[in-house]
Amino acid sequence: MLTYPNIDPVALSLGPLKVHWYGLMYLLAFLCAWGLASYRAKQRDSWTSEMVSDLVFYGALGVVLGGRVGYVLFYEFDKFLANPIWLFQVWTGGMSFHGGFIGVMLAMILWCRKYQKTWFETLDFIAPCVPTGLMFGRIGNFIGAELYGREVQDPNYPFGMIFPTDPFHLVRHPSQIYQAICEGLLLFILLWWFSSKPRPRMAVSALFLMGYGVARFVVEFFREPDADQGFILFGWMTKGQILTVPMLLIGLWMIWYAYQRKVYDWGPLKTHK
């Protein structure tokens, strides 16, 4: 069994201002996405640094607003009805990936109108930059000792740990780290490699949907369901798995359609001498 590091969730205290690790993880996520997108833009003639900066800004708004609204609608709607002001109390925690995903999709529509880019060209461009943000977000969950895993059944399992926020003090899976690795690091490597060569329009976006869908669906088997949600379907499916299934199915259809049409948005990468 591992010992939980029990890191103080407050990273910095500047007088009355307290900076939490979770907020810093979001900042790192956006900075990393901006850096990766800037690198990709230098390899394509039709992208500029201004476009990238705006794209990351629009995406950040979509993530924060969509993530919060999605969490309220998907997981805590009763609390919202009892106290609508709670929606704006973001410091209390509560963000949804699926809500953030929808928020980003809507934000990209506005960005595309501004720069006259097609929606899927834009999504294909930015998709490989997203998993690192997911990784930082899950690390933030781990530091905050939230969204931990289910109880470890094998007494010899070496990676279980007791989270200080667990009222039952059970040895649990560090599912936040599993998600950081699968939804973050591994998905980033896959998408970065796949997008390093010209692919049909929608193919990169499709691979993101499928890759995230598979990773999230599998890791949910190790993650403790929300106490007020439990298992929603068939006695074993969680809300996260249910919301992920449409992403996986849409991704499968998209990659099939992409290779049927074979429309390309860019040619070989630029070389710099």
Curated annotation (Swiss-Prot):
PANTHER family: PHOSPHATIDYLGLYCEROL--PROLIPOPROTEIN DIACYLGLYCERYL TRANSFERASE (PTHR30589:SF0), PROLIPOPROTEIN DIACYLGLYCERYL TRANSFERASE (PTHR30589)
Lineage: Bacteria, Pseudomonadati, Pseudomonadota, Gammaproteobacteria, Moraxellales
A Pfam family per the record: LGT
Metabolic or biological pathway, per its Swiss-Prot or TrEMBL entry: Protein modification; lipoprotein biosynthesis (diacylglyceryl transfer)
Protein purpose: Catalyzes the transfer of the diacylglyceryl group from phosphatidylglycerol to the sulfhydryl group of the N-terminal cysteine of a prolipoprotein, the first step in the formation of mature lipoproteins.
GO CC, one annotated term: plasma membrane
Annotated binding of a 1,2-diacyl-sn-glycero-3-phospho-(1'-sn-glycerol), by residue: R138
Methyltransferase as UniProt keyword: no
Assigned protein family: Belongs to the Lgt family.
This protein's encoding gene: lgt
Predominant place of localization: membrane
Protein name: Phosphatidylglycerol--prolipoprotein diacylglyceryl transferase
EC category name: transferase
Protein localization: Cell inner membrane
Any Gene Ontology biological process: lipoprotein biosynthetic process
GO molecular function, one term: phosphatidylglycerol-prolipoprotein diacylglyceryl transferase activity
Keyword vocabulary terms for this entry: Cell inner membrane, Cell membrane, Membrane, Transferase, Transmembrane, Transmembrane helix
Source organism, top-level taxon: Bacteria
